[in-house]
Each structure stands twice: as C-alpha cells, then as structure tokens.
C-alpha cells in the first residue's frame, strides 16, 4: 500500500485519520507518517492494510494502469 492508496482508501470509506487509526489500533501520528511517505515497520503497515481489507477495500497493483483501490462487493 502506498501513501496515495491509503488516502484513496480512507476517502472511499469516508474515514478520517482518527477512524483509520482506531480501526488499525495505531496512533493518528502513524497514519500521518504513512501518508507523508515515511517508512513504517512491516507489522504496523500490515495492521493498517488489514483494517482496510476488513472494511472491504481491495488494493489494485499498478500493472501498467496505475495504482488504485476499490470496495469489494458484499455478498
């Protein structure tokens, strides 16, 4: 997950920094650091990704078409 994907995912879910921090169990400063492009420890990044994925976010790799996110269909 890139900083841009993090911001895109938050926007798609209508989450603020505080919402994401709460869902991931990290500080708001950690989210701010991620979105600034600062390196985070892998376990911390994993927790943030897992919070997004639990909310239905799918991360789209660049694959020549550009990075992105989408919200998975709920069955």
Residue ranges, per PLM feature:
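DNA major-groove recognition helix of helix-turn-helix/homeodomain DNA-binding modules
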Residues: 25, 42-60
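Helix-turn-helix/homeodomain-like alpha-helical modules used for DNA recognition
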Residues: 57-75
